Amino acid sequence: YKAKIGYGLYIGHGGPLIINGSAIIGNNCNFSQFTTIGSLSNNAAIIEDNVYIGPQVCILENVRIGTGAMIGAGSIVTKNVEKNKVVVGNPAKAIKDVNIDVINNKWIKY
């Protein structure tokens, strides 16, 4: 397996990341240090476009993170996250909607 990673991925602070080889990561995502996208059965998470993931987040297998979602620091994501939601905690729960374009490192297509 090889993880599929879209363009514009930003990795903040150069900290360690663990990304399972079956993960799918969309365009213009922002990962903080100590992020884990794990799976025991090679069925890792699907992370859609423009997602922000805070530091020390763990995303378990068979989870889909919707476009524009934000995952708070230290969260453990065990269930799907709807698009444009902010989730925090262990297990992560939605606390509010977000409707802004937080990720500004978009590549220009020529």
What are these regions (language model features)?
Residues 1, 6-7, 12-21, 26-27, ...:
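Left-handed beta-helix
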